[in-house]
Amino acid sequence: MMMQRTQLLLPLAMEATMLAQQQRGMATLKMISIRLKSVKNIQKITQSMKMVSAAKYARAERDLKAARPYGIGAQQFFEKTEIQPDEKAEPKKLLIAVTSDRGLCGAVHTGVARLIRGELAQDEANTKVFCVGDKSRAILSRLYGKNILMVANEVGRLPPTFLDASKIANEVLQTGYDYTEGKIVYNRFKSVVSYQCSTLPIFSGSTVEKSEKLAVYDSLDSDVVKSYLEFSLASLIFYTMKEGACSEQSSRMTAMDNASKNAGEMIDKLTLTFNRTRQAVITRELIEIISGAAALT
């Protein structure tokens, strides 16, 4: 009686096992197919973003060539006047972080934030940060939120203009923070595949007025110094924003190109896995058919 029951249940158990294996194989194929479709869609997005970044990079590079005289002229003014911070005054430092509101561009914004974190670690109590772009604020606010003086948003969606730089320079001067020295921290464009995190010195109006080389001009009053200081600060910010925009677009273009290549490699691996899994399912089904036919004969 037990043998008869075993003989009756064994085919049912084998059939249930084969059915479960078949369903598991089909479920695996469906999961691979869904993932493959998702990766292909991501690759289309990254390829499109690469093309957009390439077009924006070409324009940013042209704009940078036109903006460099602004930065060079302002730098020469500070170099030739040999302005030095007042050692007797209480040391107060201002750091202007030039980034943007947009991501997906490698370590462009992280490099600027890393350099500023190093400055803050040395003298946190006497250092304030003016963030140009929301990315620098997001990174620095985790540890040094109280040191952020002000944030300029809506940066990076459109190419920076001198009007944008003038507004930022005016906000810097209107903050009421009487700094003795400062730096503009930005990314200096070198080539399509490289950039360097650099700094440019800036000084307050009181520090500039105390320069010995400027003191020889009798007609140089505080209003003239203030006007030129506003223009030179706007010129430096404009120049650094153009350098940062060009570095950002080239880095985003490279990042999207790498992402597209990685997606292509993943598509190849998933396609191979899909074909192997499908072949295994087909082979298993053929074995089941042949085994069933052999059992009937």
From Swiss-Prot:
Gene3D superfamilies: 3.40.1380.10, ATP synthase, gamma subunit, helix hairpin domain (1.10.287.80)
Family of this protein: Belongs to the ATPase gamma chain family.
Subunit description: F-type ATPases have 2 components, CF(1) - the catalytic core - and CF(0) - the membrane proton channel. CF(1) has five subunits: alpha(3), beta(3), gamma(1), delta(1), epsilon(1). CF(0) has three main subunits: a, b and c.
Topology in membrane: Peripheral membrane protein
Keyword tags: ATP synthesis, CF(1), Hydrogen ion transport, Ion transport, Membrane, Mitochondrion, Mitochondrion inner membrane, Transit peptide, Transport
A single Gene Ontology CC term: mitochondrion
PROSITE patterns: ATPASE_GAMMA
Pfam family name, one: ATP-synt
Function: Mitochondrial membrane ATP synthase (F(1)F(0) ATP synthase or Complex V) produces ATP from ADP in the presence of a proton gradient across the membrane which is generated by electron transport complexes of the respiratory chain. F-type ATPases consist of two structural domains, F(1) - containing the extramembraneous catalytic core, and F(0) - containing the membrane proton channel, linked together by a central stalk and a peripheral stalk. During catalysis, ATP synthesis in the catalytic domain of F(1) is coupled via a rotary mechanism of the central stalk subunits to proton translocation.
Gene, per the UniProt record: ATPsyngamma
Positions of disulphide bridges: none
GO molecular function term, any single one: proton-transporting ATP synthase activity, rotational mechanism
Domain of life: Eukaryota
InterPro entries cross-referenced by the UniProt entry: ATP_synth_F1_ATPase_gsu, ATP_synth_F1_gsu, ATP_synth_F1_gsu_CS
Name under which the protein is recorded: ATP synthase subunit gamma, mitochondrial
Mitochondrion as UniProt keyword: yes
